[in-house]
Amino acid sequence: YKRQPIGKATFVIANNKLTVSGTPFAGHFNGQGYRIRNLKMVAANSEEGATYGLFGTLAPGAVIENFSFDTGCSFTVASTAGSSNGVVAGLVYDATVRDITSSAPMLFQGAAGNVRITMALIGTAFAETANVTIDNVNNNGTITAENRDNNTNGGATGYHIAGIAGFTTNDGASQQKVIISDCINYGDITSATGRTAGIVAAANRYTQLANCVNHGKQLNTCPKNDAGRLGNIACNMGAGSSMIGCSNYGDLTSTTGSRCGGITSAAGDATFENCANYGTILTDSPYRGVFWGYNNAVAQWTDCTAGGKVGTYNANAPVFDSYADAEQANYLGKQGANQSALTNIAYQIGNSGGGSAGGDAELRILFIGNSFTKDAVEHLPGILKAMGIDKVKMTHMYYGGRTVPEYNNGFATVNDYRCYECNPGAAGWTESMNKTIKEVA
């Protein structure tokens, strides 16, 4: 039985214009919290511009929400033509995807030559007359990407692999955005492609990332030296794009000298605020950094934390970079003639995030609530850090839209919260899953 996606359609993006043919899904699908089990999806498309996933293409105004894929599901991309593939949806066009978690492993075995194929939870997102919303979409599944025909392109025609979205962009005459918020990738990545990231492989145009976190480690073996452009949040940031409150905790290792950054490979002229890297970045390329790999544009970095480490891969015997205080901006990444603007950067080189183990706390605070609570407590770690208060441990159990009776009734059994923790002395929150309120209390 060959399964057809819901909303079967094909697409073409040319000169920043999108054309869709077929019958995209235009409705509202609410999974009501149900879990999809044992669904094995294989995208073996030979048709140029095919879209594949549980949903193929979402039409403007469509909404899909509130369901999950269990570990018995899987997603394999074996396309032989340029296509867009996502566990949830292949193409999201002026539509909304929210409150979805996948634990399905993803496997890329595509081979189409020098053309773009995407694989993520959402293959491609395109905004024209309305914003695209991708909110609270999370990946727990491992990601494996082969490179069967040696496509070594680290640019637009490379194979785009990511935890959340493969390729995001907008219409060339529009200022509508692709908004990706509160998304987490826990999936470790083993990839041989030139564009691979934890959250978005290519934030091409007018993409806004907010409060997204990558915990997945990436090992990349792109088969050509200096071909890959790798970042653990996004590989590149295009015109009109921004990143707010995003953090990377995953290590990024290139064995073949790809350009690597903990946050992004190429920052462009994007704005970054309250972002942080705590991962270890290893590549033999001179274009490496805890923030970006190489950039020759005036990006804006404000109130960001430079943690983790950076150095050479050196045949798996790492040699870490070391700079004097006056030169510590070199940890961030290589710059061309156009220099990025750096404001209030906290250098914590060697810090993998999370502060101490929490045993020295003299005060412990537990917050339970939704997005209003999250907004209220978001900056408390930085405030306490600035005040020199390092004896407070804070935990926030977050679930959007949950009512007070639901928190109470599921006190010891419900574990679908996002657990944000700030250990004593830490400057930010660390996210985890699968904990109950009783466990953290």
Where are these regions (language model features)?
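Conserved beta-strand elements of the Class I
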Residues: L366-I368
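Catalytic nucleophile serine of serine hydrolases
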Residues: S371
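Residues that mark the start of a beta-strand
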Residues: E362-R364
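Surface-exposed repetitive/solenoidal architectures
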Residues: K2-G359
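Conserved SGNH/GDSL esterase-like catalytic core that processes O-acyl groups on lipids
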Residues: D375-A441
